[in-house]
Design a protein with these regions (language model features):
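N-terminal non-catalytic cap/leader segment that marks the start of a structured domain
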Residues: 1-115, 228, 288-292
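Flexible glycine-rich active-site/ligand-binding loops centered on an Asp-His dyad
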Residues: 103, 109-113, 117-120, 163-191, ...
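Catalytic-pocket segment enriched in acidic/His residues
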Residues: 11-14, 51-54, 65-71, 75, ...
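Short catalytic-site patches enriched in acidic/histidine residues
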Residues: 99, 116-135, 155-156, 205-214, ...
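Non-heme Fe(II) oxygenase catalytic core, chiefly the N-lobe of the double-stranded beta-helix
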Residues: 120-179
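A generic local secondary-structure boundary/capping motif
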Residues: 6, 72-74, 105-108, 132-141, ...
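Short coil/turn connectors at secondary-structure junctions
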Residues: 13-14, 78-80, 112-115, 121, ...
Length: 304
């Protein structure tokens, strides 16, 4: 029986849960394994825990609480790392280059380049339905729909051919960005102090995740998922994960050549065209941002 993994708010704190249809089951309470209370532990013991979860799924369908009554948090609250692919859709790379009057960059494969990533911290994570506090120093907060994946077993120097074997599941992410804080004013482009990726990509609430983790085995093809983001009901991004420059296999292989990926780590695989920076539009207080990806549900947050 298919199920999704979530983290819910309870009187005793955040608890890992499974979603089966319109029911939600506290995994640790149902399994009798207290350590199953956190999503990180479930990922760290994924191979051993998955059969137990499969056995619980039938129980979840007839017990637990209604999904409508569950308070969903971000599916994982404390990943060891959040690695975000930069400029990984050709149309997005082109729209960002056009901002400064530059031509669309060539496919980096033709230059012998590999994927590149920056990082967000877990302090930035919020869940579905949560309110995003605007970065007070920024007037140009932007949206970015991203297909995210969660690692389910330790990965080091893995091959592209085997890379998907290390993915436990997929979820939706919004890589919120403060476009006017990414480069420090008054400094030449060649200055070592020009770029500020922390201010650009990291503040409390800048990494909405959710609504849950859909298991990798339930995704027919992660490289063919429709992705749509709208702001106040107006579609801004409408694309497909098939348009990635560096696919998921390449990204996992590239990252694992540099360091060990651990269970619970997240990889955000890039955003397509349609971001606010390319339109000269940015988010305002009260805006409702809705993200949808095939098979993964929808992630909705309000700006404040």
């Amino acid at each position: 029986m298919s199920f999704m993994l979530a983290t819910i708010k309870t009187a005793s704190g955040p608890r890992a849960a499974m979603v089966v249809g319109d029911r939600v089951l506290d995994i640790a309470a149902a399994s009798g394994h207290a350590e199953d209370a956190t999503m990180l532990h479930i990922m760290e013991t994924w191979a051993e825990t998955l059969p137990r979860l499969d056995a619980l799924a039938t129980k979840a369908a007839t017990s637990g609480i209604p999904l409508s009554e569950a308070h969903l948090l971000a599916p994982i609250l404390n990943p060891g790392g959040i690695f975000c692919a930069g400029s990984n859709y050709g149309d997005h790379a082109a729209e960002m280059a056009a901002r400064s009057g530059q031509p669309a960059p060539p496919d980096p494969h033709t230059l012998g380049l590999r994927s590149w990533h920056f990082m967000k911290t877990r302090h930035c994570i919020i869940g579905p339905g949560a309110t995003v506090t605007m970065q007070p120093r920024s007037k140009k907060i932007d949206w970015e729909i991203e297909l995210a994946l969660i690692i389910g077993k330790t990965a080091r120097n893995v091959s592209e051919a085997d890379a998907l074997d290390y993915v436990a599941g997929y979820l939706i992410a919004n890589d919120l960005s403060a476009r006017d804080l990414g480069n420090r004013e008054g400094l030449p482009a060649t200055s070592s102090f020009k770029a500020d990726w922390i201010a650009h990509k990291n503040w409390d609430g800048s990494c909405p995740l959710g609504p849950w983790i859909t298991l990798a085995r339930d995704i027919p093809n992660p490289h063919d998922l429709k992705m749509v983001l709208d702001v106040n009901g107006v579609v801004k991004q409408d694309s497909n994960s098939s348009h990635m420059i560096f696919n998921i296999n390449e990204q996992i292989a590239d990252l694992s050549r540099n360091f060990t990926l651990h269970p619970g780590d997240l990889i955000l695989t890039g955003t397509p065209a349609g971001v606010g920076a390319g339109r000269g539009e940015f988010l305002n207080k009260g805006d409702v941002v809705r993200l949808r990806i095939d098979h993964l549900g929808e992630l909705v947050n309000t700006m404040a």
